[in-house]
């Protein structure tokens, strides 16, 4: 294991000096672009995105930065991915199917846009000589365990959606590549991530609905679904903290705020974000404990491991959601794709 425990060089700000960001035009990816290019010691950032969920406007502020290269291509184009990865030490892998509920009618989507993508990333990393992969997994890998607060070594892991299954398969693939090919992978099981440029999620959906019709809001499920919501800046801080401090060939971290909020409470926050009187809004619930097949209605995550490295969220769930929805409400493209 000659290289697996060796970190790539970091800047004085703790960032990788170069990175290929797969999904870099998306919600989280574009914030990574902002963060890395704000660091003068970062020498190169390459964005790789097929724009299925991302948008070029997310990174347009950096169009004149010569350190940035943008590749519009599909991750399944392995030769292009290998070419783009070559010369980088770090890959930030964020690409996946953005529509979790879509698998109910298209069960193959999470294999094609999840498991297969991560296999392509693993191969590109192996062939190109990249040393570190930072992988966006998800809390769904734990399955439906109700109020039990999951730590990273919880088991057995029994996903209840193909999306979560693809994330777990991705962790397994990257772990095996780390040990077999002297790589280093850090996987992150995020709570629900929110913030400006969000392209999906309950807050995004509520804001779009209320902008279209401020008198009515359709809510999936019974509104009692309860989860942790993490602001995107806190996600970036967690990933970069773990990248700087974790030395294992494969490591995994939950990232959550430690508090929880229900969908019904989010509906009220959406009205607050838009300065709408909730008494004038008709809330229509679809019923049932789950928003869709494969949804996990209650998610509890322990984030003690990432906190032990010095990370703390700057916002709790309600503040993260309110700030995110206020930002989304001012974005001209919120009401369109």
Segments (PLM) and residue ranges:
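N-terminal Rossmann-like NAD(P)+-binding domain of SDR-like oxidoreductases, especially those catalyzing
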Residues: 1-191
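Residues in well-ordered alpha-helical elements
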Residues: 79, 101, 108, 119, ...
């Amino acid at each position: 294991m000659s290289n697996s425990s060796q970190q790539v060089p970091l800047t004085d700000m703790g960032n990788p000096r170069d990175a290929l960001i797969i999904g870099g035009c998306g919600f989280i990816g574009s914030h990574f672009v902002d963060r890395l290019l704000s660091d003068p010691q970062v020498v190169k950032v390459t964005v790789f995105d097929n724009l299925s969920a991302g948008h070029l406007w997310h990174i347009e502020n950096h169009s004149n930065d010569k350190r940035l290269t943008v590749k519009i291509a599909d991750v399944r184009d392995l030769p292009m991915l290998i070419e783009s990865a070559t010369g980088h030490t770090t890959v930030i892998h964020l690409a996946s199917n953005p529509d979790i509920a879509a698998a109910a009618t298209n069960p193959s989507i999470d294999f094609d846009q999840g498991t297969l993508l991560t296999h392509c990333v693993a191969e590109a990393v192996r062939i190109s000589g990249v040393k570190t992969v930072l992988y966006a997994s998800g809390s769904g890998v734990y399955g439906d365990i109700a109020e039990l607060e999951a730590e990273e070594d919880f088991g057995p892991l029994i996903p209840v959606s193909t999306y979560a299954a693809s994330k777990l398969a991705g962790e397994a693939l990257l772990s095996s590549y780390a040990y077999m090919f002297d790589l280093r992978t850090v996987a992150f099981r995020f709570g629900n991530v929110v913030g400006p440029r969000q392209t999906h999620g309950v807050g995004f959906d509520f804001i779009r609905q209320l902008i279209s019709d401020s008198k009515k809001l359709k809510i999936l499920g019974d509104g009692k679904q309860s989860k942790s919501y993490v602001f995107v800046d806190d996600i970036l801080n967690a990933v970069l903290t773990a990248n700087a401090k974790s030395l294992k060939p494969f490591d995994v971290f939950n990232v959550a705020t430690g508090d929880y909020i229900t969908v019904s409470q989010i509906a009220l926050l959406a009205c607050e974000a838009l300065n709408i009187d909730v008494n004038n809004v008709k809330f229509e619930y679809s019923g049932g404990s789950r928003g869709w097949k494969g949804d996990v209605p209650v998610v509890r995550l322990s984030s003690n491991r990432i906190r032990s490295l010095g990370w703390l969220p700057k916002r709790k769930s309600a503040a993260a959601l309110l700030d995110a929805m206020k930002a989304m409400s001012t974005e001209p493209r919120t009401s369109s794709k």
